[in-house]
């Protein structure tokens, strides 16, 4: 028995050797380091930990398995999905081919590609969301709409930087500050950009308390920030029950492509408000939401293979995503300023920044900044109106872009 030969063979077949022997292996080593950094941000810095930890570990698994000689035993096979999307391939849109050759993370990713996970996340979000503040002040819809400005400005910026229309639309939706919506649209239009777009979307959502306050100070005066708003009216139970039914009917008829997101959002909210499906509401808010989050985050992380992530496009996406988020915040604030004057200075424009759909973080930032300038001010419930309007607004914006570029 040749002991030295056996040891040499084992060493050459190990994953450590593959990083240096395999063509491009060093890139996967970089991706593994990036996964470690993301795990640090999620666990230690608590940047969207429920999503970022899963995304980071999915990234770690896919880069450990695919390029260390595992071949058909890899957890994720990007070439399967390239064939799935290639119209010239005999396996175009063939889930059967994917499933017959899939690794574990490929099976997970089917739920992303089919739009199942983002829709189920919206079901849970709907079950957790109280649309009462929006119903009490319907004008909040305008703030939710104005906060989508960054989506379309970033889209134009992406086109100017050489991205295609579908890619630009996927990048622009980062401005909606809604991770599931960004994942849903990107999977449909530009799946090769899913990793960097998801990372950008969730990172900027976590950085809301740092990004928004300087912009709020820039766009408003001290007098505006001190405005104390009157308590909103009480919303009846009947209004809360009718609302999801009406919104689902109107929005889906207007933009059929929004049906998966808006339909699930309003179904979840109906479970919450109707009073006869408490068990379903509780399941959607807790067990289902947690299970889907695990699959969604891990499968999104699995797409972060080196050849897609380590490129100049990723840097552009990070920059454009920040611009989209900042411009959306400014759009909401400018809408708030307009409403401040239109209402006879009775509306505090700080609630406009909550028009991005990061619920309830953006509303809390409005509350914190408002209290800084007026200790007696309580803007949280007022800010929740545009905040939940932003959830609907981002879904509508995604539906519009999908209708235009989805073919």
Regions found by a protein language model. Give the residues of each.
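N-terminal alpha-helical transmembrane segments of multi-pass membrane transport
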Residues: 1-78, 100
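Hydrophobic transmembrane alpha-helices of secondary-active transporters
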Residues: 38, 109-135, 269-271, 289-311
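Interfacial helix-loop-helix linkers and transmembrane-helix boundary segments
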Residues: 44-52, 70-71, 107-108, 128-143, ...
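Alpha-helical membrane segments and immediately flanking helix-loop junctions
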Residues: 110-115, 122-128, 143-153, 157, ...
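Entry/N-cap segments of selected transmembrane alpha helices
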Residues: 134-155, 306-332, 383-387
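Alpha-helical transmembrane segments
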Residues: 192-210, 320-328, 351-354
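Membrane-embedded hairpin module used as a gating/binding unit in multi-pass transport
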Residues: 203-276
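Transmembrane helical segments that form the transport core of multi-pass membrane transport proteins
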Residues: 248-332
